[in-house]
Amino acid sequence: RYDRSGSSASFSRAFRMNPLAEAYDEEGNIRSAAWEDSSEAFSVNPLSSLNNKSNDIRSKVITNNVVEIKLPFVPGLSYKLNTGYTYQSSSWKQYQGMDTYYGARSNGILNTDDWHSQEWILENIITYTREFGKHRIFFTGLYSAQSYEKEGNGMEGKDFPNDVMYYYQISKAATMSGSSSYTKQNHIS
């Protein structure tokens, strides 16, 4: 499990920013707009994203297993089983409050994205090796199956009455939209 919460400053906006712009107001707070300009490309303060409330937690479990059996009653015959399993989950939430450039224009913007995935692989390998004088026989047989499945849900809310509850207030949004996705893949060879 690892935590990737927080937002970083925008270096691309810093390169485009007017050098005369002020990133902080008189009280030392980060301004949402560094320059009063009609062009969004030049007016967004590259530091304003530091005011975003962001929560990004991810978890991942991986297991790989191998079993090899050499059959003593048939010289040169062996069986190998390879298995693997991966589970991942992610919970991402970001609230752009009234103190951010985009949040101020929409009375707050909340985005959430939650997903989980699992995948597995199973490989059966039979190998036969035998030497007869100057001759050698080598045979490999493989049967493999694998699966991948991912499910995700996202929400966006805009126009909040206040900034008090950050990303725990989706039901308070005046405008909401949602999305969901599902993917499943199976392979046999």
Language-model features: where?
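Residue-level signature of outer-membrane beta-barrel architecture
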Residues: V67-L71, Y128-R130
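Surface-exposed loop/interface segments of Gram-negative outer-membrane beta-barrel transport/assembly proteins
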Residues: R1-I62, S78-H187
